Curated annotation (Swiss-Prot):
GO molecular function annotations of the record: electron transfer activity; heme binding; metal ion binding
Protein name: Cytochrome c homolog
Binding site for heme c: C84, C87, H88, M150
PANTHER family: CYTOCHROME C (PTHR11961)
Cytoplasmic compartment spans: 1-8
Membrane topology recorded in Swiss-Prot or TrEMBL: Single-pass type II membrane protein
Compartments in which it is found: Cell membrane
One Pfam family linked to the record: Cytochrom_C
Gene: cycM
Organism of this sequence: Rickettsia conorii (strain ATCC VR-613 / Malish 7)
Amino acid sequence: MSGKELNKIVAAILFASLIAMMVGFVANILYKPTLELQHRGYSVAVQESSENQNTTALEQAPVNIPELMKTANADNGREIAKKCLMCHSLDKDGPNKLGPHLWDVTGRPKASIADYKYSPALSKLGGVWDDDSLFAFLHKPSSYAPGTKMSFAGISKPQDIADVILFLKTYVHDK
């Protein structure tokens, strides 16, 4: 095959492509397709879940923590706190995992475990872990300490938070 024949073949392919493109443009001009967006399938109306309603109610209404603590259930708190054990240990002087151990956390100064590197957000808070601070932190860690390393979204139901706090107070000390 000579160079002239190869040039003819390439020119024919390019010319055919150009003709096909031009035919497409002309057809679009003549027929002016309507580009009305049509919805495919069906849409589902989503109602706000009760969990979201509880979260917004907790953020809007003041919560009486001492009253919740009177009705708290440590056994329910134990079940809810199983989520915590993925990142925390409950053993006395237990190993730090992704988070520090939670032995005797109630009443302990914040960011006080020496061999754990806390985020700057939590390190500069100061104070001790009392019912109020634990409640706020467990409800929404990112709101209580913006910039915290803790990626847990929080516990939405106030009674569940009180149950976990009671569990942390009683179960750990009895071990």
